[in-house]
Amino acid sequence: MVNVNKSFIVIFSILLVSCYTEETPYSNSLISSPHPLASQAGNIIYSKGGNAFDAAVAAAFTLTVVEPSMSGIGGRLQVIYKQADGDILGIDATTQIPEGFKTEDKELPSYGYSTIGIPGVVAGLIKLHEDNGVLDLKTVMEPSIALAEDGFYLYPGEIKRLQSEIEKIESFEGTKLYFLNSEGKSFIPGDKLVQKDLANTLKIIAKNGKKGFYEGEIAEKMVNDIQENGGYITKEDLKNYTVRKSEVLTGKFNGYDIHTLNLPSYGSITIQMIQIFDQLKINNERDWTLKISSAVEESYKYRFFQNNIDSVNSILSLTRAKQIANNIENNQTEVAFNSNLYEMDVADIAQGHTAHLTTSDKYGNVVSLTQTLGPNMGSRVATKGLGFLYNVTMGPYLGGYLGEEKPGDRASSHISPTIFTKNNEVVLALGAAGGRMIPIAINQVAYRYLKQKFPLSDALIMPRVYKYESPIYIESHLGVNRFNDYEIYSESQNVERIRAEAYFGRVHAIALDTINKKWKGSADPDWEGSVSDFK
């Protein structure tokens, strides 16, 4: 019998472990998000051994704290993600119309208690984490809880958005409590936002998971406040809310596969639009302005035909995309020039609402996540003791897109988190904020990067165009005008410059450097987006 010294075995084992270096397919992990504190939260989670799913959930909860006007735990969520060496999957956690909603009520206001649908963000984030994360939920939520409890200094974008809603904020007691300063006035630069009640709400979620939000004391406070003020949500509505598996749609673009989500996401329109782009002959920036804007307009005519499989298949058809592109090419006309350019200031239009973030890790997991309250500040309602704003779901904001609203329906919107792959490897993942501008922003950035081969950062800051039963609108503000060669198309009498931050969407993207197997990211130049890299 051979005797082996136990001490030798222990020492050998230690040496073996210390010499082992984990090999991963990619050299870094990354996050691109609308706020530096959210990107920082994702990086903290990476540093603790978390993956792209943990980082996405941490950053998403953080965004509900630091950008409360754009998204929140009272809102809705859509996610598309690719597991390392796995499938591309989707999560539908959008808001749902309560069972007691009265469909005959045609005169609903555009905000207030009667517009609030059943929230989905908390259920969606917890589902994403439970299925894919590696850290515990408490650890993942620590950054958001700390920021809510200790406070942070407001950035200019959030101050501007809150200031624009001052009259509506003053209409609701809970909202006044949380979103006016200590003097009862709008926040100004230098103000610190401390959210003790929101911190307590997040702590309960971190401890009890989905049940902590949809049942128990939080649910009771929500229902009591909403019911007492003319809203529809009941305890049963909250308890019965479930996350659904989204249908992933796939199309083709310039040799890449594009993946996004079916209803309640507008993924079919996103795919159709970029497939039309792909068939157009774009030789210069004049072509870009005229033809891309025409493609946007043609594609948007199909938004109302997404609610059955035959219509969706027709929308996704490459043959249909080629037909539309041919019509655009054949119907192009010369435009007269007008030196008296009309510049339109749309500061009074809701700008860039919603929040999108993208994460990727060294293992190859990729997450593209969009969450929202609807328009700026959603319903403008917050319940005392809870600390967060509710969504808008019923009423004119979303009503009429795909027919009559009825109990149990989920809110359809332009939200379209998107992933591009080649040979089953992610090459670009992105999404956008900005209502109807979301598919437009996603596709124009993707076209600039994947087909015109601009650097990702340039693709995000180049001017975007829009047209739908309107003149051609083109982005024109600080950060965009540096591309002076493009001034020629702003002289057309059919073009109006839009001088408003985030009007054309806020895109946050991650792409793969396929040679060095390294993730690179870029944040939209409008407002305070940032990228954080962890090696």
Feature roles, as predicted:
Residues 65-72, 80-82, 89, 232-233, ...:
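Active-site rim segments in enzyme catalytic domains, especially the processed small/beta chain
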Residues 282-372, 386, 494-499:
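Internal maturation/activation junctions in enzymes
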Residues 244-245, 351-354, 413-415:
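Short, small/polar residue-rich loop motifs at catalytic or cofactor-binding pockets
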Residues 8-16:
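Bacterial N-terminal signal peptides
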